[in-house]
Every structure is written in C-alpha cells, then in structure tokens.
Amino acid sequence: MIKFSINMHRGCFGGCAFCTISAHQGKFVVCRSKESIVKEAKKIIAMPDFKGYISDLGGPSANMYGMHGRNLKACEHCKRPSCVNPMVCPNLITDHSKLLEVYHAVDALPGVKKSFIGSGVRYDLILHKSKDEKSNEAAMQYARELITRHVSGRLKVAPENTSDRVLKFMRKPSFSLFYEFKRLFDKINKEAGLRQQIIPYFISSHPGCHEEDMAELAVITKGLDFHLEQVQDFTPTPMTVATTAFYSGYDPYTLEPIFCAKTPREKLAQRMFFFWYKPEERGAIERELRRIGRADLIAKLYDGVQYHGRARYDAKAVGSSPERPDKHEQGRGRRQGQEWRDERRQTKGQRADRQAQAQRENGQRQKPKRTSFNPNFHPKTNKRR
C-alpha cells in the first residue's frame, strides 16, 4: 500500500495469462462498502502530513469495483478463466455507477482537494456496449470524470502488446480497442482544455512473441507518438499459464509448440525495440531487422534518414558473428579502415611499445607495468619478493 491511498476491492476477473492476482486473490471481486472507504478517507485526512491529495482510489484493476455476475449460481459453476476474454461475459454487470458514487463521496469530504486513480484501468470494460443503456451511459460518464478529475497528468493502461495473436494468448483485448480508447481520451482532453498523457504498459519476450512482433510494436507506437518507458521483460511467475508455456514450450490448452525467448540474447533482441528512439540502439535494431527479413520497417522507424552512428560492439543481431567496423558499417573511410586492420595485426608487445612511445612524446610519465595485483609480486621484476 502506498501512503494516502485506499484499496477499495480485491480480486480480478481479467484472467491475464501472465498474472497471478486471480490465483491468490480470486476471480470474484470483493468490494468494501462506501461507508468503509469514506471512514478510511477521514482517517487519512486526520494525518498531520496529509496535504489534501489521495494518491489512489483503486485495486488490482481500478474500475472493477461493484462488478459481479447477474446470476451468481452460474458464476460458481463457470470454468472460464476470464470474464472479459475473448469477449465480455453477458452475465457480467459492467455498471460503473457504484464506483462513481464512491468517487463523489470521497471528493465531497472537507480536506480532500483531489483524489487520483493510480491503479491500472481496464479500458475494455469502459468501451463495452451492454444491453443496458444506463450502464453504457455510466461508463461514458466514468471515462469523462476519470480523465478530467482523477488523473494526475498520466493515465496508466496496459495493452501489453500490439499483435492480436500474442494478445489472444495473453487473454488481453485486441489492440484496436486501445486505438478507440485513445481517441476517446484525446477527445475528452481537447474538450476540457487539458494536455494529459496515456502511459501504456508493454511486455517483451512473452511466450508466443517474436522479434517481428516487437518490431511492428515499435512502428505502431511510434505512429502513436509514444516514447515507451513503462515496459518490462516477461518474468516467469508460478501459477500462471504463461509460465507453463515458457517452461514446457507448449500451449497447455492446445498442446501446440509455442516460441519462447529464453536466452539473454533472444530477450535483448526483443526488448531493444521498446527503445528505438535511443541513438545507441539504432545500429542493433537495423541489423536485427535485416536478419529477420523486415528491412522494410527501417524506413518506417527512422523516416528514411541514413544511419552513420557507431553501434556498441555487443549490440549485434541474434546469432550473427561480430562484424568488422569497416566503412560500410560504421561510415569509416578506406584509410581509417586500413589503420584499424593494421592495429589488429600488431602483437600485444608492439601495442604496448607504441603506447609507451606516445606517452614519452607527450611528456607524460610512463607508469610501471603491473602484471599482477598480488602485493607479493614486484611490478618491475615480476618476481616474488
């Protein structure tokens, strides 16, 4: 728990393949009463160092408060791991009215200047169109109040990937829903005269995700004007479907083989696409795109601007051998390339003599050569004292 934050409910019916919340908190959302939440808010207000800002009114997913099945008996016998994937269950009540009542009650307390939502928001629940029009209206009202009153400047959401194939295995909604939510977010911001941001969370190296998927993710997020920061590499966690697939190499439901990036080089080859905008990553990204046969994405990522930078030595494509830094790779001229090859042909002793001569010419004192860090060895004679 973060100081000055209030946990309103526990449990999550999202059932994401990489998440353990449903395993240790349960699939059914258990909510605190509005009176209990207001009572805790009053205790926070009474704290001597409280400045009037509640950092979070949330839970595992901020907007699952008050949601449950219409027929609870059917829920008790249901074997679906997720109530919202591949589509929202028709038995699920997705009304945001109770959540809005809590927000209004907390904001009305004297001493509360503003209450923020720091937990992640499920935008698929906001955009879901149910048969109940009042529920749909409450969802739009929630979106407007959330964006205009309860965002500190950045709203956190978790699309996790852009490939629908990978998202299907993750049990996450299609990325097209994120486009729709971003349009709604931008529209409300424009109408309210705000300049707030969406902060999307993404995962690399998830089972089923390839380098090509991450390359397309980089192109798509660039088109949305994102410079990603809130990212992580997939970490196997007990009691999850994704970890079962990572360990076994098979989809546990279909028993079909599934690709998993496991070695550090394979993981780095995916992770670096998050940071396409960093100059030090460009050389490795271009080599990797050529290796996987997607050189067409280079122009989309870098707008056709030719790369003349110097890449890191270890940032080479997965499975490739170290390349010589010749004029074609690093923009060196023929003379510089020849000097580099001549220097590589020199023996260790020749290089040491050359360095010593350069130091003498520059008037620098030549430091004694030490071949061991053992204090029992003399640095000049290299013999034991």
Q: What role is predicted for each listed range?
A:
Residues M1-N7, G26, V84, F275:
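Flexible inter-domain linker/hinge segments
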Residues M1-T20, V38, I45, K51-G58:
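N-terminal pre-triad scaffold of radical SAM enzymes
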Residues C12, C16, I37, V157, ...:
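Conserved, mostly hydrophobic/aromatic
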Residues C19-S36:
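Iron-sulfur (Fe-S) cluster-binding segments and ferredoxin-like electron-carrier domains
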Residues K43-I199, I203-P207:
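Conserved SAM/AdoMet-binding glycine-rich loop
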Residues H68-S97, K168-M170, S174-S176, K222-L228, ...:
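Radical SAM enzyme [4Fe-4S]-AdoMet core and its adjacent flexible, acidic
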Residues H206-G223:
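Catalytic cores of alpha/beta
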